């Protein structure tokens, strides 16, 4: 591989050190290596902000691992940044001097504002959804809060609180008592209060979280079959579960990994304070953050206004999808959706996911015609899809799995991006759009009227269409039968 197409970003965080190595290909990035080590640097800071020798050694040990991988990458294509703990440590110079010797490249201690800006850029490049957003990143020793529209930030804040420092301060006795949480939340709200008005003034339509705490919450909710949106009610529920466990070493929540458990209660307390102080309705997980911001900054790539569209285009190119056919199916599905939207009340994000499934429905053919829906579902489940959340990927895979043949109803109910009933409705529209666009020509798609009454669909075709299209009639009869097996009434006229 040509090393000039390789880029590396290293983030010396207060809780973990991370390395991301990517390859630039045709304006998009392909992840080659992700290495993360829990160093817990912030735990080595004493009251005088002096970093202990043990903490520094843990950091250097990790960097020796990273250094081996960096040897293959040109130095101008490597960026190493240090964040909150090394901003605070009075002896940071000693740590950084040795770190630079180990890595063989400069280490830059970035300001809190620069960290917030880079986090926002990482989110803007990798996360779909509404343009106007609030980004929250809870680190080990600092928390970044950024508002912005598209690629532009409107306010940037880096606050001195993090999951490691709050752990040492409010959970040092390792008790998960109500009082510990109350103290941690009150302190976090006190830190937030001076910046809350400005954040609210700029406003947001969506809120995304870009930290280990939010990742842990996402994993818990996926494991427990909840939908992926983080809400204050869910956070309070998890806090009560943690309090029931009593002690940090006994903390057990389905979906919470051992690796994340130590700083989970402190991160949870900070997040509850943020939700409460800023009156956040819901939050989803960001697709990227600081390291992605560093990489895209080195590549000088503009923020694509529609990340999901860019992702779909890249995948269609990679798997040689017939885009004309994909657009034909999407247009038909959209037409069907408009005809039933008053009866079914399908939200804009569900519409977008249906149209995404239309664009990707034939990627399984790149493996083999036989079992193409299974191949398509497998590919979507395992591909990197910037702009789509893990739950949205699961829904797309489920729709593609059920694009034809008998319906696997349980798979539609196991995804958690949309309610099961909505997943069923999207699946029905996708199947009908694929069926009627099957001859791959616009002039051969009949005029179809679709009406919905509760779950009953009535499909009306031009008068003599069925008589003149015996194969088409057979396919429609078969589809009607498959839908009836799962109690989806389809009446064809």
Curated annotation (Swiss-Prot):
Record EC number: 3.6.1.40
Known pathway: Purine metabolism; ppGpp biosynthesis; ppGpp from GTP: step 2/2
GO BP of this protein: guanosine pentaphosphate catabolic process; guanosine tetraphosphate biosynthetic process; nucleobase-containing small molecule interconversion
EC class (word): hydrolase
Record flagged with keyword Nucleotidyltransferase: no
Entry similarity comment: Belongs to the GppA/Ppx family. GppA subfamily.
The protein's role, per its UniProt record: Catalyzes the conversion of pppGpp to ppGpp. Guanosine pentaphosphate (pppGpp) is a cytoplasmic signaling molecule which together with ppGpp controls the 'stringent response', an adaptive process that allows bacteria to respond to amino acid starvation, resulting in the coordinated regulation of numerous cellular activities.
Record's protein name: Guanosine-5'-triphosphate,3'-diphosphate pyrophosphatase
Organism: Salmonella heidelberg (strain SL476)
Gene that specifies this protein: gppA
